[in-house]
């Protein structure tokens, strides 16, 4: 079977296991009496999961000993979770007669047990032990990134032991299906993919870390838009073939009756909520017909009604954002109550009783939650997007309640006020509609107040008043100043209101992303699993390398050989008397970055490869390395090449005795690796034996048979017990065989001397 076919089969099995896990999670929340007829099928599925684990478990474990893949890892976790939780449901069903429905829910959902998402992680480094607690998804990702940064001061056994604890956490989370519990995810914590995306997008002069503060992560978990409609029950009811057709018909009839009552009540309420001023104006206009003369007053009322109607039903322009949102939280609460009424009605029609599901049995506890917790828990009747839109609607409503903003956002306000004043002038009471409409129609607008009569001028002599006005135009200065001030006040209010609305809209757009990520249904992404697999494969490759080189045909172990001291002294004296070629510093620096970088960020091995400094940049930035350490790391090789770069004593290369603390141990490991790189560079230029290849043990890979492929070169294993291994005369594809020569050493100079001896003419080594 080819690799593609094997992958297809694993994907098919993984999909079926995921479907089974989803069904188990649904059954945990259903009335246990509904599970009793399904016990046979549940047991058959549980036995199938056991059979799959027995049949695939051995092969999956054997593969994990050499190299893990995300698919195989996810399948292993899903099978383990499915077996444990499926049998938990079966045990709870067997005990339901004694424990009752509440005991069933407490057993299946582990309500009386401590939180299952708290996992302690212990890591032994060369600089001392590290203890951490993983309780969120971003905690697991942060620990994996920290372990990736500290890989060169961590042995493979300690690294794999720590990853085993992380795997337990991932089994309870990533292995539990596709839906993420809301208490596990905090989208305000950016992941490594968020950082990489911000590094390749336009920053507009803003620092990456400042942009990360405004980042909402959608990689560790991915949000899904879920829509819930009122007709979902009616839509799926005809497909419930397990009940009699008569009961289905009765349930459909009951749903139609409920919907008719709801629509009738909604229409009656809508008809009774019309503004009283508009009602009076409508009755006033309805009492007129074409055989009656239309006064200017009646025409003004009709004109105001026209403008009010045109702004309400007009199709000019796009609707405002405030008008596009759904009803407020009270409306959503009514929608949820109607959904539960529908569900209870259908259950009574189909089964003759209502079922004790989890949300009904624990309704009192759920009602005790506050608004925020209630929205996080969610509802089967209201989608998260409806909650989000209701929140934004409430935000807009509160902001728009200011009179200043109401005048700007609601242009009909002035029209309604004018209509109300007009009806009041003609003697119509807008509160109860009393008054004689016929007499009111004869009122002329010219006599409704405003300008005084022509003959009632206060000035006795018209000519004198006119002369004074013409000679002294400044007498209206106060009036003009008042009008100008009013106009400026109006313009300032409009500008201030528009700016306020723009700021509110910008705030809503920014916060909406976080609201959607928090309240929507989230599913597990692939970032966390890929990060775990990459870190696991790095430590696993180191273990496989150490096991592979131990099977070589010729093994020379100089780690505890006292006879190698003369070789150490000779090679050290020969290399230290020669200066380092400064033209080699760029390549030497890149080799340093390549050897200290962790296994997670392997950008140099991508199809579109990036230099080693890019991968190291992602590694140190994702762990929040302090700026002074980043500066020291960037200039490390340049500084080391200018001084005495030989720091290790005889057979004490990669020795950390007496050093405590992660930072101090890490800095010493950098010095050891820098010494190895500089010694190899000078060795190649002095003895003219070609380039000495410095390789990493965690960049070796197994073949299809599981054998580790190790090409010829000097390997750094990052193991304090055996830090340096030289592999000579390996097969063309890196296979370790009888002709392969392997040299173990814990001293750089004695190892180079041994390599020089093996490369001498007539030795047969290469």
Swiss-Prot record:
<dbReference type="GO" id="GO:0042025">
    <property type="term" value="C:host cell nucleus"/>
</dbReference>
<dbReference type="GO" id="GO:0005524">
    <property type="term" value="F:ATP binding"/>
</dbReference>
<comment type="similarity">
    <text>Belongs to the herpesviridae TRM1 protein family.</text>
</comment>
<keyword id="KW-0863">Zinc-finger</keyword>
<dbReference type="GO" id="GO:0008270">
    <property type="term" value="F:zinc ion binding"/>
</dbReference>
<feature type="zinc finger region" description="C3H1-type">
    <location>
        <begin position="191"/>
        <end position="219"/>
    </location>
</feature>
<keyword id="KW-0479">Metal-binding</keyword>
<comment type="subunit">
    <text>Associates with TRM2 and TRM3 to form the tripartite terminase complex. Interacts with portal protein.</text>
</comment>
<keyword id="KW-1188">Viral release from host cell</keyword>
<dbReference type="Pfam" id="PF01366">
    <property type="entry name" value="PRTP"/>
</dbReference>
<keyword id="KW-0547">Nucleotide-binding</keyword>
<dbReference type="InterPro" id="IPR000501">
    <property type="entry name" value="UL28/UL56"/>
</dbReference>
<feature type="binding site">
    <location>
        <begin position="683"/>
        <end position="690"/>
    </location>
    <ligand>
        <name>ATP</name>
    </ligand>
</feature>
<keyword id="KW-0231">Viral genome packaging</keyword>
<keyword id="KW-0862">Zinc</keyword>
<comment type="function">
    <text>Component of the molecular motor that translocates viral genomic DNA in empty capsid during DNA packaging. Forms a tripartite terminase complex together with TRM2 and TRM3 in the host cytoplasm. Once the complex reaches the host nucleus, it interacts with the capsid portal vertex. This portal forms a ring in which genomic DNA is translocated into the capsid. TRM1 carries an endonuclease activity that plays an important role for the cleavage of concatemeric viral DNA into unit length genomes.</text>
</comment>
<dbReference type="GO" id="GO:0019073">
    <property type="term" value="P:viral DNA genome packaging"/>
</dbReference>
<keyword id="KW-1048">Host nucleus</keyword>
<protein>
    <recommendedName>
        <fullName>Tripartite terminase subunit 1</fullName>
    </recommendedName>
</protein>
<keyword id="KW-0426">Late protein</keyword>
<keyword id="KW-0067">ATP-binding</keyword>
């Amino acid at each position: 079977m080819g690799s593609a076919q094997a992958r297809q089969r694993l994907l098919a099995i993984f999909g079926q296991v995921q479907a089974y896990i989803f069904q188990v999670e649904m059954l945990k929340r259903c009335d246990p009496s509904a599970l009793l007829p399904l016990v046979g099928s549940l047991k058959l599925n549980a036995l199938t999961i056991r059979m799959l684990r027995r049949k695939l478990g051995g092969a999956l474990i054997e593969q994990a000993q050499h190299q893990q893949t995300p698919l195989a890892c996810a399948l292993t976790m899903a099978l383990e979770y499915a077996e444990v939780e499926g049998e938990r449901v079966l045990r709870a069903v067997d005990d339901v007669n004694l424990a009752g429905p509440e005991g069933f829910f407490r057993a299946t959902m582990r309500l009386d047990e401590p939180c299952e998402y708290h996992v302690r992680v212990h890591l032994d480094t060369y600089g001392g032990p590290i203890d951490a607690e993983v309780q969120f998804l971003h905690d697991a990702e942060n620990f994996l990134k920290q372990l990736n940064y500290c890989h060169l001061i961590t042995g493979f056994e300690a690294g794999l032991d720590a990853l085993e604890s992380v795997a337990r956490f991932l089994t309870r989370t990533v292995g539990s299906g596709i839906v993420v519990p809301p208490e596990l995810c905090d989208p305000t914590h950016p992941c490594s993919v968020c950082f990489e995306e911000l590094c390749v997008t336009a920053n507009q002069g803003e620092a990456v870390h400042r942009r990360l503060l405004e980042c909402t992560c959608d990689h560790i978990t991915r949000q899904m838009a879920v829509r819930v409609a009122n007709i979902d029950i009616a839509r799926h009811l005809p497909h419930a073939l397990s009940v009699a057709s008569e009961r289905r018909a009765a349930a459909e009839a009951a749903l139609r009756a409920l919907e008719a009552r709801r629509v009738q009540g909604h229409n009656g309420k809508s008809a009774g909520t019309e503004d009283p001023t508009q009602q009076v104006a409508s009755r006033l206009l309805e009492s007129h017909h074409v055989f009656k003369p239309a006064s200017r007053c009646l025409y003004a009322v009709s004109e105001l009604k026209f403008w009010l109607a045109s702004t309400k039903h007009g199709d000019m322009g796009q609707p405002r954002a405030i008008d596009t949102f759904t009803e407020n939280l009270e409306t959503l609460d009514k929608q949820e109550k109607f959904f539960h009424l529908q569900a209870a009605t259908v259950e009574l029609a189909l089964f003759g009783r209502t079922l004790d599901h989890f949300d009904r049995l624990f309704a009192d506890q759920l009602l005790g939650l506050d608004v925020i917790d209630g929205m996080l828990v969610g509802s089967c009747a209201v989608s998260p997007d409806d909650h989000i839109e209701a929140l934004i609607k409430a935000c807009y409503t509160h902001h728009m309640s200011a009179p200043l903003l109401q005048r700007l956002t609601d242009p009909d306000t002035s029209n309604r006020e004018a209509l109300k004043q007009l009806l009041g002038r003609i003697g119509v009471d807008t509160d109860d509609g009393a008054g004689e409409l016929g007499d009111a129609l004869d009122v002329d607008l010219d006599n409704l107040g405003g300008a005084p009569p022509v003959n009632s001028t206060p000035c006795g002599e018209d000519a004198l008043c006119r002369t004074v006005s013409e000679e002294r135009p400044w007498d209206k200065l106060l009036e003009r100043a008042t009008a100008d001030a009013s106009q400026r006040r109006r313009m300032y209010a409009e500008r201030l209101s528009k700016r306020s609305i723009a700021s509110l809209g910008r705030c809503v757009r920014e916060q909406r992303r976080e609201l959607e990520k928090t309240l929507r249904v989230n599913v597990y992404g692939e970032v966390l699993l890929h990060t775990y697999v990459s870190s696991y494969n790095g430590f696993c490759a180191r273990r496989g390398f150490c096991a592979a080189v131990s099977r070589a045909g010729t093994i020379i172990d100089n780690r505890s050989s006292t006879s190698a001291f003369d070789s150490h002294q000779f090679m050290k004296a020969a290399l230290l008397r020669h200066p380092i070629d400064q033209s080699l510093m760029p390549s030497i620096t890149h080799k340093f970055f390549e050897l200290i970088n962790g296994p997670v960020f392997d950008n140099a091995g991508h199809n579109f490869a990036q230099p080693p400094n890019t991968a190291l940049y992602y590694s140190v930035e994702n762990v929040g390395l302090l700026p002074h350490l980043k500066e020291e790391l960037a200039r490390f090789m340049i500084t080391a090449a200018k001084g005495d770069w030989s720091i290790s004593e005889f057979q004490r290369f990669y020795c950390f005795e007496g050093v405590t603390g992660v930072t101090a141990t890490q800095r010493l490991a950098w010095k050891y690796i820098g010494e190895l790189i500089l010694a190899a560079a000078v060795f190649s230029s002095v003895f003219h034996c070609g380039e000495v290849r410095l390789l990493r043990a965690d960049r070796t890979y197994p073949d299809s048979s599981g054998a580790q492929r190790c090409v010829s070169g000097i390997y750094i294993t990052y193991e304090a017990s055996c830090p340096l291994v030289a592999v000579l005369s390996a097969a063309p594809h890196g296979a370790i065989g009888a002709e392969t020569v392997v040299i173990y050493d814990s001293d750089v100079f004695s190892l180079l001397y041994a390599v020089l001896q093996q490369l001498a003419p007539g030795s047969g080594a290469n």
